[in-house]
Amino acid sequence: MINIKDISKSSNQSEEKSLKGTSSKTKYPFAAKSLFKGSNNITPYYLSTSNTFQCVASESIQTWLLSDDGHIFTSSGNFVLDVSSGGYFVELVQLNSNSKTQIWTIDTTNNKIQNQGNGKYLDIDNLKICVAPLNGNATQKWTTFRRAPIPTGNWGYFQSKQLDSNNNYWGLSVLNNSKSYNTSVVMNKVQAKSIGQIWQMTNDGHILSRLDGNLVLDIGPSINGSKTNYYLDTNVYKANDLKQQWGINENNQIFNQYYPNLCIGFVGELGVDSTVNCVLAQPSSASDINFQWITNPTYSLNEIVSEVPEPFPAYTSGDLLASYQYISNIATNGHTDDIRSLYTSINVSLEIFYVNVTNATCPSSIHSTEDFSNVQNQIKNELTYAITVRLVFENYSGFYSKLFSQGSTNLTNLANLINVDMSSDQVVNGDYTDAITSVFYAIISEIPIGGSIIANIGESAVEFGELYAESNDSGPSTYQVTLSKLYDHLNENYENEMTNAQSMKNTILQDWGMMSKTFALCFLPTKNPSSLNINGLDFQKISTIASLAYQTAMIQMLLPTNYQIYFTPAGYYAPVSSDDYSYTDSTGTYIMAEIDNCNSYPPKALTDKLWNNGVSKQEVFTSSYGWNLATSVTYYNMVDKYSGMFKLSFPTVKNFTSVPMQFVMTNGSDRVGTFNVKTHFAGLASTYYYSGALGHHYYDIAVTDIDGNKVANFTVDNNLEALEGSYVSIKTGSLVVQPGYVVGNPTCNQGSFSQGFAASILIPIYKSN
């Protein structure tokens, strides 16, 4: 049995269309919203796979895939809608191609969804989905619309559609970029390098701030005691707190899950004051621009390529067909009588075709000059659109090629700086998608106005490749690669992304609707987040930013092979002589040094590539966001402070997901401790624990998300050796990973008794696709 949910996060939703495919493999994403308004006659409901009724922002549970033969799949493609054996309730089951009750007809004219097995119509019974004979009730009326695969989990801005008097965009901002909880969220002019303006929407509807791992958007205090008007602030991420969960509706309003009729807006006039208060209130109307938002980037191409195909005007007979074939021959100098087949060809000049079409005159063999003129004008329009679309992708390909043109040389130079043997079989965590996503993040954070154009194309190409891949499963091989194969791995993925971009371009060029919509985006003002207008873009600046970001991503992959972090708790001596390789906060001092020698530090030429290019020290030394250095606990000159503790392994769990985690560490029946792990941060098991005798000691670790759902279980094997410190690893056969997650290659570093530092192990956990 499945249920319906309140309105959820959606992308910019297009007008309703007849949802029909063209091949047995084609599946188009769509959403179905009930015209039934519920008990309050306000809240809209969506067809959903979830078994609760609260509104959520997870697009995946309310996105369906319609095949051309009438099957309605879940967004993962694993299950289809079917009528239960009782013939009343609707359920999710495995595909059975012989079952007619799994086939549905969507009637967009009459707003009905009919089951072909029993002829009944999709209906609602106490918020449960069922089928019933046609009855005329609103519960049987559904409006369907295209839903683009806009990804959650990427960083960007939430910008108001309302511009100030100088046509500047303003966006949601944490006041003064403060990491403190209960800080006001306000409106500020969108500007570069303002991390407090950058957010990420998670699958469950939390809106994370880039300022800190567990910092999320929350409802603030009431305005003058009102129950319908609130300020906004930040708070710590809480599980199942609907006041912290949000969605985006078809009016581009950001609504709250606890108060689904209240949306985020602002009071005041943008541009008059440097800061304008954000509020949670009820919009005056669906078109109240003070309550409408644009995400930046918008991933505008995602929506376009997920549209139902709209073919070119068909010319199948008479003078229309004759005109099309004649014009095609004239344009291509006799190469073909089907000019549209060449729109995707890289070996032809569409500009020359356009000139030839323009100069063509109607031959005497074609009697209708009107038909000839109509075809001629249509082909001229198509060529104009195709030329523009191709130019956009050619510029993107040029940018992308330049980014990777020195890939081998750059990787070699970095390896030499880090003192890494690139011919070795040492395994590193090298996820290409994370690397390229970090490049797009760097571009939009440095150039928020205009930089989104590159991200709109690039991120859409990434999503396009994943959407149309034969499998969406992401296994350990995605993240694990030997140093000797790292360049080949990166180069192969680079070529795949180039192919994805080309495939997306060709998909657009073969569809009149997609080509028309893409052409329109090419003439939006560059500052518009949906724009593909490359005129005036500073490609040199963009390329420089991208190159530095990609270099940083390579350092993130290579650094853990030779360096780790040595952490000395506050109050104890730490031999710091340079800020180049150290960082201190209230918890203690972090020093970056070689794995085998805590007194051998990275060269200045390497640290300059980090600190001189704006890399955050706090993120590097605490293994936050893209950094994943194992951490060892160290007490200099105090080896006997805690008997045997330096022979311990100190596990670090790195959370690469947007959901907080925790892990429990036990030793037999002894519970060592529970350790929290922020989103995109690392959690260090820092409890002091007596190691015991020499030999193998096993520490069981159970990782769960903030809701208590299992993520992974494994056992750390800590092998104590006399005078040698300890050797640490994941016990063979102990790793169990839940569906939806991937555990990357653990970084295992030996401890040293003589130098007074513990063994370290970092276990990275990723969300799989």
From Swiss-Prot:
Q: Which GO terms describe its molecular function?
A: carbohydrate binding
Induction field: Induced by high levels of extracellular Ca(2+).
Q: How does it sit in the membrane?
A: Peripheral membrane protein
Bilayer-crossing residues are: none
| One GO CC annotation | nucleus
Looking up InterPro entries in the UniProt record yields:
Ca_Up-reg_Membrane_Reg, Ricin_B-like_lectins, Ricin_B_lectin
Q: Where is this region: Disordered?
A: 1-21
Residue ranges constituting the Ricin B-type lectin domain according to the UniProt record: 25-145, 116-249
The biological processes this protein is annotated with in GO are:
response to cation stress
Entry keywords, A to Z: Cytoplasm, Lectin, Membrane, Repeat
- Subcellular location(s) of the protein: Cytoplasm; Membrane
Tree of life domain: Eukaryota
Family matches, as Pfam families: Ricin_B_lectin
Q: Which family does it belong to?
A: Belongs to the cup family.
Q: What does this protein do?
A: May play an important role in stabilizing and/or regulating the cell membrane during Ca(2+) stress or certain stages of development.
Q: What is the official name of this protein in its record?
A: Calcium up-regulated protein F
Give the encoding gene's name.
cupF
